[in-house]
Amino acid sequence: MQQSVIALLKELRAYALEKSLRAAIYYHEEDSYLMRFANSAISLNTNEHLVRLQISVYDGNKHADYEMIADPNQIEPLKRGIDTAAEMASRAQALSYTPSIPCYRETVIDMQAYDPFLAGITNPERLEFFNTLARGLETETIKLSGVFSNGTTITAQISTESEHTQYFACTDASITAVLSHQKLKWEVNALQSAQAKTELNPERLRAELAFLVRQYSENPAVQLPLGKYTVVFGAAAVGDVLDMFNWVGPNGGMMKRGYSFLKEEQIGQPVFSPRFTLTDDPRCQATYPVSHDLTGKRRERFPLFEAGVLKAFFWSQDDADEFGREATGHSVYHN
C-alpha cells in the first residue's frame, strides 16, 4: 500500500517543482467501519473510505493551505489543487514571521501502531463482541445500545525541499456500550478503545456493565446534598480532560496567546499535586504514536509535568516560528 501512496506524492512533488513552487503535500486516508446498536438490535452498519489531500504552498512570508477530497487514481484534479494553493499563496497577506517549510531528512515508514488483524475485523466479529458483553444483562425493560467503530488511518508527507517521504499507518477501535432501563429511565455505560485486536475484551466490558446494573437495580436511589466531593474519573473521562488540557495547558502557542491557565514563569515550579506526572512518550503504543512529526522532526520522550512540577511547554512548528521558539516535535494530528 505504501508504494502507491509514496509514488503519488512523488508525482505531485515533481509537478510542484515544475511550477517552481515551494510546497508540502500531506496525504490523509481513512478506512472506517461503524456498527450501531439501538433497542438491542443493529440499527446501522456502514463503512466509509476517504482520501484527503492538504497542499501547503510557501512564498517567503506568505503561506496558504488548500484541502480537497482526493481520488488517488485521478491525478489531474490533484495537480489543479496544487495550482489553486499556489494562487491562494500569491494573494495571501504576508505574515509577521517566515513559516518553516518541512524538509524531510530521511525516508520514514512507520507502522508500529498498525495491526492487520484489527484492520481486518469482520461484521460477525463485531456482532459477537456485543453479544458477549451483553449476555445475561438484557431484560424486557433493560435494553442495549451502543457503537462499535474501528478503522485504519494512513498519513504521508512530502515536500519540494527533499525527495524523502514519511508514511504512517495505524489502526484503532472504539466501543461504547449502554444499558438503559425503559421504565426507570436510568442508563449505564462502559467504554473501551484498542490499538490492536488482542486488546479487545468484551468480558471486561460485561463485568463493568454488570457491576453498574447491580448498583442501580439493587440499591435505593439517593440525592446528594450540595457540598464538596471526591470524584473518581475513569479512563475515558481522563482522556477527555487531557484532550482539553492539550489546548489550555502546556501548549506554548496557546500560552503566548493568553488561552492557557499556565504561565512561562511557572516552569520549574509545582502547579499540581506531587502525585501528578504527565509525559508525552512516542514509544507508548496505547497512544497511537508516530516516530516523527509532520515536519520530519524525530519525536522523543517529552516530560510535561513531573511530580506536579511544570517542566516544559510543547511547541508546534508554526507556533515556534511565530514566537521565535524551538519546535519540540509536536506538529502532529493528535497530542
Region roles according to the model:
Residues 7-14, 20-33, 76-168, 204-239:
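Acidic low-complexity segments
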Residues 33-90:
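N-terminal alpha-helical targeting/anchoring segments
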